[in-house]
Regions:
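FabD-like malonyl-/acyl-CoA
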Residues: 1-117
Length: 119
């Protein structure tokens, strides 16, 4: 049987997403940490005390960092999807999962994409 993975776009985020993976998986932690930007991803994704996770400039990097972490967990477990797809922003995560670019590059491209949205 072949496996397909569909990466979510903006709108699937919620406070606490990825926290259990981060605490239990070195692969998730390494991928997530490589996505560092100019704000505290951990605080926004895991706690969101300021309620900013639903603001686009935070949502998109958090979603991509989370997806990169999940991709790392799948790889760590030997799961190799035959098909990858992404919905809107999820396309960046699917491309990262396909090896087109690294987790850090996916985050950098997401940040660039955000800069274009705010022009």
């Amino acid at each position: 049987m072949k496996l397909a993975v569909l990466y979510a776009g903006q709108g699937a985020q919620h406070p606490g997403m990825g926290k259990e993976f981060y605490e239990s998986s070195p692969a998730f932690r390494a991928a997530f940490d490589s996505a560092a930007l100019d704000f505290d991803l951990h605080r926004v994704c895991f706690e969101d005390p300021d309620g900013v996770l639903n603001q686009t400039e935070y949502t998109q990097p958090c979603m991509v960092a989370f997806a990169c972490g999940v991709t790392a967990v799948l790889a760590e477990k030997g799961v190799k999807p035959a098909y990858l797809a992404g919905l809107s922003l999820g396309e960046y995560s699917a491309l990262q999962a396909a090896g087109v670019f690294t987790a850090k590059q996916a985050i950098e491209l997401t940040a660039f994409r955000l800069s274009l949205i705010h022009i």
